[in-house]
């Protein structure tokens, strides 16, 4: 398997540990993610064209946190979590030269998460567009994601919880 596949798998295992509240499993999976960071950084160190290390990664994240949180590290004020998020996205857009609220959203996200992220970003930027443009399944799913957001829910999390309940019912019926 490609190394990116392992990284993605470990990320999902970490998500599962968080959602199930299994702190021992979470500790184990965070260790596996940390191993992935170290592994990919080690590969990067051997790149003769553009080498960098795990120390460079750590330094970059510290610099990013300082730049994007002037309410903590500078003199700006953010009164709410929404203010913090808006400031973060505005600074990130400037740094990356993004012109749209939806620029930079990875289209490889799981589809329900992708839909939720796109709609959240658009709404946060004051852009209100109907989630679906026809009566096809994709548009209906977009509307369901929008409804979940309006209800304060995350569609991806809700569907995973429903899948866990389904698995339990299947196991029960198998006797």
Each language-model region and where it sits:
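Flexible "arm" and connector segments at domain edges
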Residues: 1-29, 35-175
């Amino acid at each position: 398997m490609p190394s990116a596949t392992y990284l993605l798998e470990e990320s999902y295992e970490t998500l599962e540990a968080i959602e199930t509240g299994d702190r021992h499993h979470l500790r184990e999976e965070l260790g596996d993610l940390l191993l992935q960071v170290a592994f990919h950084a080690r590969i990067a160190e051997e790149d003769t064209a553009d080498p960098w290390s795990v120390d460079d990664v750590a330094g970059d994240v510290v610099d990013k946190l300082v730049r994007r949180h002037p309410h903590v590290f500078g003199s700006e004020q953010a009164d709410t979590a929404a203010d913090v998020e808006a400031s973060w996205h505005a600074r990130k857009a400037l740094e990356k030269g993004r012109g749209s609220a939806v620029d930079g959203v990875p289209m490889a996200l799981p589809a329900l998460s992708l839909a939720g992220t796109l709609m959240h970003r658009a709404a946060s930027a004051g852009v209100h567009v109907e989630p679906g443009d026809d009566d096809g399944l994709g548009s209906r799913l977009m509307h369901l994601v929008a409804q979940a957001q309006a209800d304060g829910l995350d569609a991806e999390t809700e569907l995973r919880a429903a899948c866990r309940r389904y698995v339990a019912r299947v196991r029960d019926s198998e006797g």
